[in-house]
From Swiss-Prot:
Forms part of the ribosomal stalk, playing a central role in the interaction of the ribosome with GTP-bound translation factors. GO terms for molecular function: large ribosomal subunit rRNA binding; structural constituent of ribosome. Part of the ribosomal stalk of the 50S ribosomal subunit. The N-terminus interacts with L11 and the large rRNA to form the base of the stalk. The C-terminus forms an elongated spine to which L12 dimers bind in a sequential fashion forming a multimeric L10(L12)X complex. It comes from the Bacteria. This is Large ribosomal subunit protein uL10. The keyword rRNA-binding applies.
Length: 180
């Protein structure tokens, strides 16, 4: 059991983390054993290095830390009932973290169950987790944008090179006629 001073320090630490986090996902870990939680943490570490963490946090501590970090917690009080584990992402792609925990949940028959999440400061309820898990990752989105921009440029280059080739053929034909 934590002393009051330890709880205050933990609230300070977590509020600083939550201020920097692009994703804060709330889940009920009941039904997961230590081995499964360790496996989830390992998967997060493999994909996102140390940018994402999955921690079991006392409801009152999480509530106070989020409130101190500037989140509107009064509207989401149902999140703070029952066992609570929080996945937060300080560095890296938050959508990738959502995909990892969602896929893990499918493997473990719906565990952990989702309570909701904050993504870039906006709250989404538990039903939105599946929709967010289907979004492309940041890398995939960047690749789509690059290929979308690259296509017209490539076409323009082909048109220019085709025009230059036609001009070159015409000039060569004129040169051949004059040399005859």
């Amino acid at each position: 059991m934590l002393t009051r001073k330890q709880k205050e320090l933990l609230v300070e630490e977590l509020s600083a983390i939550f201020e920097k986090s692009s994703l804060i996902l709330f889940s009920d870990y009941k039904g997961l054993n230590v081995e499964q939680i360790t496996k989830l943490r390992r998967k997060l570490r493999e994909k996102l290095a140390n940018g994402a963490r999955y921690r079991v946090i006392k409801n009152s501590v999480a509530y106070l830390a989020l409130k101190k970090a500037g989140y509107s917690v009064d509207e989401i009080e149902e999140v703070f009932s029952g066992p609570l584990a929080i996945l937060y992402v300080e560095e890296g792609d938050p959508i990738e973290a959502i995909k990892i925990i969602y896929d893990f949940s499918k493997e473990t028959k719906g565990l952990p169950s989702f309570k909701g999440l904050y993504l870039d400061g906006r709250f989404f309820d538990a039903e939105e987790v599946e929709n967010l898990s289907k979004l492309p990752s940041k890398e995939q989105l960047l690749a789509m944008v690059v290929s979308g921009v690259q296509g017209p440029i490539r076409g323009f280059v082909n048109v220019l090179s085709g025009t230059l080739k036609s001009l070159l053929y015409a000039l060569n034909a004129i040169k051949d006629k004059k040399s005859e």
